[in-house]
Every structure is written in C-alpha cells, then in structure tokens.
From Swiss-Prot:
HAMAP family registered for this protein in UniProt: Ribosomal_uS15_B
InterPro entries: Ribosomal_uS15, Ribosomal_uS15_bac-type, uS15_NS1_RNA-bd_sf
BP-aspect Gene Ontology terms: translation
Family (UniProt): Belongs to the universal ribosomal protein uS15 family.
Gene field: rps15
Protein name: Small ribosomal subunit protein uS15c
PANTHER family named in the record: RIBOSOMAL PROTEIN S15, BACTERIAL AND ORGANELLAR (PTHR23321), SMALL RIBOSOMAL SUBUNIT PROTEIN US15M (PTHR23321:SF26)
PROSITE patterns: RIBOSOMAL_S15
Length: 87
C-alpha cells in the first residue's frame, strides 16, 4: 500500500512540525473523511470539518510552494495530489 511506504519515509525524514508532515497528516484526514462522507451524505458537521482541513492544507501547500518549489513538487508527487492553482 502506498500510504504505509509514505508514512515510513516521511516519519523517518521529517519532524512532526514540518510542513511536509502536516500536509501528510491533513491528506490522511481528508481521505478518511471523504470515504466517510460517501456513506453518510447528510453528515454536515463532517463536511464542514473537511472544508476546514482542505483550507489548512491549501494554505500550507501555498506557503511551501512559495518558500521551496522543489520540496513542494516532491511532496505533491509523493502524496498523489493535484497542484494548487496560482493566480
């Protein structure tokens, strides 16, 4: 499973406060909530939580893209997420 290999790599390389680790945790939460919401479509509290986590992850990714573009590209490729839209 891809998730387990990413966990071992990130947890060994990074500290828990790093941007990469935080984005990784948010991505796991997003995937869990998405699968939960597929079963429970009217769980509006979980929908709100998902939107909040998506916003936090988006802000962290924008920060990382601004500070270090190479680390940003590696992270989005490793986590298999789309690149954020730039204005």
């Amino acid at each position: 499973m891809v998730k387990n290999s990413v966990i071992s790599v990130i947890s060994q390389e990074e500290k828990k406060g790093s941007v990469e680790f935080q984005v990784f945790n948010f991505t796991n939460k997003i995937r869990r909530l998405t699968s939960h919401l597929e079963l429970h479509k009217k769980d509006y509290l979980s929908q709100r939580g998902l939107k909040k986590i998506l916003g936090k992850r988006q802000r962290l990714l924008a920060y990382l893209a601004k500070k270090n573009r190479v680390r940003y590209k590696e992270l989005i490729n490793r986590l298999d997420i789309r690149e954020t839209k730039t204005r």
